[in-house]
Amino acid sequence: MNSAWHGNEDIMAEKVDYGTLKKGGFMRQKQKNNFSLRLAVVGGYLTAENLTKIAEVAEKYGDGHVHLTSRQGVEIPFIKLKDIDAVKEELAEGGCRPGVCGPRVRTVTACQGNTICPSGNIDSYDIAVKLDERYFGRELPHKFKFGVTGCQNNCLKAEENDVGIKGAADVKWIEDKCIGCGVCEKACRTGAITMQDGKVAVDYDKCNYCGRCAKSCPTDAWDAPSAYIISFAGTFGNSISKGESPLPLIRNEEQLFRACD
């Protein structure tokens, strides 16, 4: 009986379009007729419902474990060829969808941004979702990666991505609110802020738009709307190159997505 089934599975395998399966997130394993499914996990965000369904599918169709990828993704290995359609259907019930592989736009990575992190200057996850809606799965000559990080701490290593987006604070001093305490000068790590005759002086050539001055100010004497620093052409595969930031500070989402396009 077991031998007969494996024979049927081999016949099925001969008719499979592996390129299409890979495009849909199912990667062939070294074990015959086994696949590892890469899920689309935007910005590393999964709900309890997602996690429950992933666990159920891994137990039912895999070998009971999942792999967390280097780009915040989840892979379910040891899925049999015959179960692929059922796996997709059951994952969809839990709000999960397959990712993509090959030469196309991959899942967007992101930190938690200013919704959770005290250092965050932007809502990283919101930007990641919008990027995913615009570009996910788009066919390109080579795999393409977006990364969104909320501030200069750069937890997501923005410059490692083909397009990296880093949250910034477009800081402006508000003299009327300032008490001349000098806290912002001490908070500034780049030496962009100095106190001169009890007043703040900012050298914007030194400013990296981290926003520490605004966050440290006890009297809210800084205006610090969200902004973006974008980098291009970062690669960290077989060849390594740091993404470059040729554009000035981007001050709104419309400009940001125009730059991404």
Question: Which residues fall in each region the model found?
Answer:
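Small-residue-enriched alpha-helical segments and adjacent helix-cap loops
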Residues: E9-A13, L37-V171, E175-I179, A187
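Intrinsically disordered, low-complexity polar/charged tails and linkers
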Residues: A4-N34, E49
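Short, solvent-exposed beta-strand edge segments and adjacent coil->beta transition regions
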Residues: N34-S36, R71-G73, D197-K199, E244-S245
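Short beta-strand elements
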Residues: G25-R28, V163-G167, Y228-G237
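A hydrophobic, small-residue-rich beta->alpha segment in the mid-to-C-terminal subdomain
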Residues: A227-I229, G234-D261
